Amino acid sequence: WSDNCREKLLNFVKGNGRSSEIIDLLKGRLDEQNKHPWQSINYLESHDDLAFIDRICSPQDWTDGKPPQRVIKQAKLAMGLLLLSPGIPMIASGQDYLRSKQGVQNTYQRGDLNALDYNQFKETEAFHNWTKSLISLRLSKDGEFFRLSHFMGDDQYISVMGPNNSIAHIILPEKSESCEQILLILVNPSDHEISILLPEICDGKKEHLLIGEKSSRIGVVPSLCLQVWKLT
């Protein structure tokens, strides 16, 4: 289990992390001792310890059965980076709809907190649908580069660290910068829309947004947002 993944991701979406660590995660190389990407079980929460949403905000900050909108966006970013990273992702029961355990770390013998409250699902169904769309992308033909059986070469990645810890991460399916098709992951963990200067390899290609909030143009990323583009 990659505690590294859990801690680095949560720190990143809360504004305390480093973009270089997230780039390593997106390459499947955050845990340096691994010889294969599938040796990492990537997770944000498990059956014990705190629910990941309780580590982003206090349950006392919830209103009308859901956390603040900013916190939901932070959680979406964390879930997106989890499911779009090489390795084996693990999602705990209820995590897909932001199940809270009321900030209690050790819920051993706390059936009242461990039970899944499906009434809450009605309030956070949009997050559940986001999780479903991420899983669908990961399992698709376009998502094969998130399901690696072996590490890709450094020449198959181009990563740009932009302002405010933002990231442009390019995956080249072939070991050539003249690829006809590339994947572009854009990440903005800040509270403001940012613009990232993209590498020349992105110029002149047809753009298709696979997942994420739409923006005025490619390279402009809304606040607390993850986008995946296919460029052909």
Task: Name these PLM-found stretches.
Residues Q69-I72, L83-T232:
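Carbohydrate-interacting/catalytic domains
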Residues W1-S93, Y97-Q102, S176-S178, I185-S190:
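Conserved alpha/beta catalytic core and glycan-binding cleft of carbohydrate-active enzymes
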